[in-house]
Amino acid sequence: MMITKQSYQRFALMRVFVFSLSAFIFNTTEFVPVALLSDIAKSFEMESATVGLMITAYAWVVSLGSLPLMLLSAKIERKRLLLFLFALFIFSHILSALAWNFWVLLLSRMGIAFAHSIFWSITASLVIRVAPRNKKQQALGLLALGSSLAMILGLPLGRIIGQILDWRSTFGVIGGVATLIMLLMWKLLPHLPSRNAGTLASVPILMKRPLLVGIYLLVIMVISGHFTTYSYIEPFIIQISQFSPDITTLMLFVFGLAGVVGSFLFGRLYAKNSRKFIAFAMVLVICPQLLLFVFKNLEWVIFLQIFLWGIGITSLTIALQMRVLQLAPDATDVASAIFSGSYNVGIGSGALFGSIVIHQLGLEYIGFVGGALGLLALFWLRFITIKFKKT
């Protein structure tokens, strides 16, 4: 009997691991164009700023597509749906690698964004379903770990492949890795009927839950603040702090590494006091941004700020996602789709705000504006916490 239980635990952990790998590959491809922007622009004889529109477009497609695409797929058995999403993901990466002009590349990125929209709408609830008993929270942490590793390993490796070969090879390799993950899913995942996915009728029901709506608004606010600064952290470190490109790369690596620590802390501390955990994680996101310019020339302080910031944003993202699932157990996929859409509204808005700040005020002010948006989000958290204390 003990062997059977151990075998079950091991098999369940393998399934969680497959989802973690999936998170890794999806997050890698979302942000890898940042590392390849100059090479892509050069190959199409375009400006980097114009090519960068595909990053903005990706975020907005995910924002607009998450809920309607999830609703359209609400009744589809989840394993079959995941395999279809990976097939679309792989085909789109083949198209990216073969793209004969920028518009074909942009079209291929839209295909990836569609897959992303549904994937992140259903994955959090699925990883909890396949996780070992009494390991649900840790499973969500492992899912976030996959996302963090994309920043630590995915982006640097993508850039290295692009430098050694070319940017097309990077997309080709991502498609190849996705094919292996798809085979693992086909082999390891059980039949997963759609459960508590929700329907269009679930949306007005969820919107009548004030704390849940408050959390969605909180996500938009705090993620907008984060990406106001983070979208332009590389040029800030090089141009304002005047650190070398190698130091800049190392700092971005530290940011991703901090995400692993954030995932670990979530698994250990969130259940003890979820409200305080969320508030403290927000402080870790806000303070480094506000102090970024103040300590711009102190290398070790910037390293520390980057590390704390990375812990904060990863911890906060998982905690808010868990809170959404707790507040909408009857429509987890719809709730997750709205969460994913809200998060990507934050990404797109933050990048836009940062661009406006740079053009109107200067690159050195991005941390102040991003931190100020974070403070507004913190005040909003305080308000909804007091207003809906019993929820």
From Swiss-Prot:
InterPro entries in UniProt: MFS (IPR011701), MFS_dom (IPR020846), MFS_Efflux_Transporters (IPR050189), MFS_trans_sf (IPR036259), Sugar_effux_transptr_put (IPR023495)
Classification via Pfam families: MFS_1
Location of this chain's protein in the cell: Cell inner membrane
Keywords: Cell inner membrane, Cell membrane, Membrane, Sugar transport, Transmembrane, Transmembrane helix, Transport
Top-rank taxon: Bacteria
CDD domains: MFS_NepI_like (cd17324)
Function field: Involved in the efflux of sugars. The physiological role may be the reduction of the intracellular concentration of toxic sugars or sugar metabolites.
Name this protein carries in UniProt: Probable sugar efflux transporter
Organism: Helicobacter pylori (strain J99 / ATCC 700824) (Campylobacter pylori J99)
Gene that this polypeptide is encoded by: sotB
